Amino acid sequence: MCVRVINGGNNTMNKKLVALLAVATMGISVVGATPQTQFTKGETQVDLGAASVETKADGFKAAHKWNFDGDITHALRDKTAIQYGYHGLNSKHVDSNMQEVNLIQTLSKNFALYGGWGRIHSDAIKHTNNIAQVGIIGKAALGSKVDVYGKAGIGTKETTTWEAGLGYKATDDLDINAGYRYVNTKAT
């Protein structure tokens, strides 16, 4: 499922809901909404999606499992937003997740910077990495309804994240994407 709800300054809420067919790709596939690079004061956006996760660590590999993926973003002012994200990282034998809170700043129509805090937790090793992180989001139109996007970040605890994919604008308030996300962190 992918849901995008945008609440503009006039307090009217447009809700769109679409059921997605299963997307079969190798690695971590993400189905949700395309990352934002522009913000208008007072807007709130909710992105809900699914991710198929495969875990690898020191010769260990756990099979794919579908997970919840979601973000809520609120524009504090034009070009500046705060975002909370939850990313399920569960695989067949490992229960993990990443939660993050970031401040996002628009650089241009196609680029934004983000920085904040991330928490990567794994039940398998009973450990949590609390990380400071920074990164960049890029997005470009490939046509009137299709975007290509990328997101890359680095953080403490030898953490790197990147994501890339394509987004399709179904309506003014709904877009759907399919992409690949990579998360790597030090298991301490």
Predicted features along the sequence, with ranges:
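Outer-membrane beta-barrel translocator/channel fold
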Residues: 57, 88-98, 117-132, 153-159, ...
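Repeated loop/turn-to-beta-strand initiation elements of outer-membrane beta-barrel proteins
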Residues: 44-46, 78-84, 109-115, 142-148, ...
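Mid-chain, structured segments of secreted extracytoplasmic proteins
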Residues: 81-116
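Surface-exposed, polar helix/loop patches in the mature regions of secreted/periplasmic/lumenal proteins
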Residues: 106-147
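Cleavable N-terminal export/targeting peptides
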Residues: 1-43
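Short glycine/proline- and aromatic-enriched beta-strand/turn motifs that initiate or cap beta-hairpins
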Residues: 31-90
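Residues on the lipid-exposed face of transmembrane beta-strands in outer-membrane beta-barrel proteins
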Residues: 70-74, 101-105, 134-140, 164-168
